[in-house]
Amino acid sequence: LISRRVRGLGVEADLLPADTPANALDHYEGIILSGGPASVTEEGAPMPDANVFGLGVPVLGLCYGHHLMVQMLGGSVRSTGRSEYGKAVLEVKDPDRVFDGLEVSQTVWMSHGDLVESLPDGFKVLGITADCPTAAIGNTDDNLYGLQFHPEVHHTPKGVDILRNF
């Protein structure tokens, strides 16, 4: 679904396995780490090549990808013990790149059981919801962004705009 949304924006998109070596990705203009059913708190969770964050291209982590990026770069993620599933109201605190030109309050779709507990160095909170104080984060110097919500689904009305901004 993510690739379909990106292609719908007129951008070429390839769907690659999580274990693709970073040196095979250096010709891309951006990388999206997708969501999925796994948890970074579990043994054997799929992990990308850590060098993906040093390629000098923008990286967007969505849900599980958001958790991966945080954990791999030195932040922490914990299981909430329950799932958040459904609509939430995102309050944009810093209208950086991904939220440029968008409303400061918008509906987003959540589907997760883990939560970012602490941010890696260089990251800041870009948006929050009532139940998620790290719903959108970014390291704007390195063009690394993480979203707890799912911009690719139609339940996030401005999701395509967020992907376009990325």
Regions found by a protein language model. Give the residues of each.
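Short, charged, surface-exposed secondary-structure boundary motifs
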Residues: 25, 86-93, 119, 137, ...
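A conserved active-site-flanking secondary-structure segment within enzyme catalytic domains
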Residues: 17, 50, 57, 67-113, ...
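Histidine-centered divalent metal-coordination motifs
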Residues: 63, 112, 150
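Flexible gly/pro-rich beta->alpha loop and the following alpha-helix that scaffold active-site loops
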Residues: 2-62, 66-67, 71-73, 164-165
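A glycine-centered loop/beta-turn motif at secondary-structure junctions
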Residues: 119-122, 128-166
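Residue-level signal for well-ordered alpha-helical positions
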Residues: 2-5, 72-76, 102, 122, ...
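Proline-centered loop/turn at the N-terminus of a beta-strand
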Residues: 56-60, 107, 124, 143
